[in-house]
Amino acid sequence: MSAETELLGMPESLKDIKHIILVLSGKGGVGKSSVTTQTALTLCLKGYKVGVLDIDLTGPSLPRMFGLENKQVYQASKGWIPVSVPTTSGGELKLMSLGFLLDDRGNSVVWRGPKKSAMIKQFIKDVDWGDLDYLIIDTPPGTSDEHISIAEELRWAAPDGAIIVTTPQGVATADVRKEINFCKKVNFNILGVIENMSGFICPHCAECTDIFSRGGGFKLASEYNVPYLGNIPIDPTFVELIEKQTGFKESLVDLYKDSGLYVIFSKILDNVLNGEVKSGTDQ
């Protein structure tokens, strides 16, 4: 980190993080946390050191996704120590979430904007991530206080950009447009659009059926001339993996590497990492 960057206010906690990626969506219920989880799992399986920061303060679901609901974070001299996700293959994976700080996982978080902003500032400045290749930030839906706060806190950290998540339906893409416009206003680079829930994979015959429409994400990317990253189907086996890691004490990282979704995400992220994604109008 240069002296100029320190002067501009780069948080000490971020100085050893090579890349920062946000996962955004203007619409709730599109599977954003699922995309965050699978992005982190895929990067970890590729051998990277990965951190995941959950700033969905009123709905912190990632501890459940990673099978870490009963874990706690601890305070050290440099800040909170994130919870490590167990793995016997690939790189390293750590998670920080407000869910670890609640006395009861069922407690509701009823905070006004200033308290949310203060919590996000603390997450950015007071977590001891150590040396990371990637920090993935999971955000709540919309363009609310959390988004404004994270944009302000990252203004000197130069994040690589945002992955925008939508589902195929027009009611979803209409709200996701607002998120794309938000990124443009705060100068977040858009790494691309993912169309999630694009088809349903039958657990019996593995046939993919379009239970919703298809192509909404591609049309959205084309309209804004931003990269289109690909389609992610609904695969019941991913839910089974989450439940299996909890019931059988197996690592989600190790379970995920043999799933069909890992193949899909691996291809998407290879294109992102290699800078080979194309805009929607180029495909």
UniProtKB/Swiss-Prot annotation:
The gene is CFD1. This is Cytosolic Fe-S cluster assembly factor CFD1. Keywords: 4Fe-4S, ATP-binding, Cytoplasm, Iron, Iron-sulfur, Metal-binding, Nucleotide-binding. GO terms for cellular component: cytosol. Heterotetramer of 2 NBP35 and 2 CFD1 chains. The keyword Ubl conjugation does not apply. CDD domains: Mrp_NBP35. Binds 4 [4Fe-4S] clusters per heterotetramer. Contains two stable clusters in the N-termini of NBP35 and two labile, bridging clusters between subunits of the NBP35-CFD1 heterotetramer. [4Fe-4S] cluster binds at residues 202, 205. The keyword Cell inner membrane does not apply. Its cofactor is [4Fe-4S] cluster. One of its GO terms (biological process) is iron-sulfur cluster assembly. ATP binds at residues 26-33. Belongs to the Mrp/NBP35 ATP-binding proteins family. NUBP2/CFD1 subfamily. It comes from Kluyveromyces lactis (strain ATCC 8585 / CBS 2359 / DSM 70799 / NBRC 1267 / NRRL Y-1140 / WM37). It comes from the Eukaryota. It is found in: Cytoplasm.
